[in-house]
Amino acid sequence: SNDQTFVVLSAMSGTTNSLVEISDYLYKKNPEGANEHINALENTYMRHVETLYSTEEYKEKTRSFLREEFNYLRSFTKDLFTSFEEKSIVAQGEIISTNMVANYMQEQGFNVCLLNALDFMRTDKNVEPDPHYIKEKLTDIMNEHQGHQVYITQGFICRNAYGEIDNLQRGGSDYTASLIGVALNAEEIQIWTDIDGMHNND
């Protein structure tokens, strides 16, 4: 069938809390504490790679992505830390989960397209979602990436009216899924929640 599915994912269970803890250490100017938490989180994800993927190709592809991600997190331990940096750190939870699921689905033979929510999810100056902007940008992006069975993107994260990384605050990924459903005139929106590990799909 020609049915297309658009999947919006949250961060993996416990990840957002860990990223907030890492941010707390950085606010308190404790890079050692932050690095300990970053290393622990990286080890957790590397263990998931071993169980999630069946081929060495996809294990290595995902490990390589994760190494880059966690090095990016470590880069925050060297600079001034503000709420802007915190939002960038917290956004990585969704970026990691969507990349891992996209790799998994590709390995399973699905024709998958991973879209970056930061390219189309935006709030206005009142910190409310900007539905016209979202519809216009997402329509353009979907037109550029036609012919996939499954589209995957991040829930919760967005850019604000000034183009800075931000988040939708309330409702998280469910809210993102609803906004995307409206923007694309989706036939239905299914919200799945299950706090166990990788099943946090909305």
Residue ranges and their predicted role:
Residues S1-D202:
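Nucleotide/pyrophosphate-binding catalytic subdomain
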